[in-house]
UniProtKB/Swiss-Prot annotation:
The lineage of its organism: Bacteria, Pseudomonadati, Thermodesulfobacteriota, Desulfovibrionia, Desulfovibrionales. GO terms for biological process: translation. Pfam families: Ribosomal_S16 (PF00886). This is Small ribosomal subunit protein bS16. Keywords: Ribonucleoprotein, Ribosomal protein.
Amino acid sequence: MSVKLRLARMGNKKRAFYRIVAVNSAARRDGRPLEFLGFYNPMVNPAEVKIDTAKVQKWLDQGAEPTDTVRTLLKKQAG
């Protein structure tokens, strides 16, 4: 089982926000995650990002692979 750190879409039509989750790579986009790691709300200005870095680091140490978008959000959060 390979694990991905990816975005799961939440919210209403045209008012989306995203949860950052650790999920089995074969699972569907909004399927049951292994763990919630944070959220990303692009609808507010500036975009709101909150990530639990300890949980993310735990998954990265276990070999989880972030998607490109999550990788970008992690870089913004770190610096």
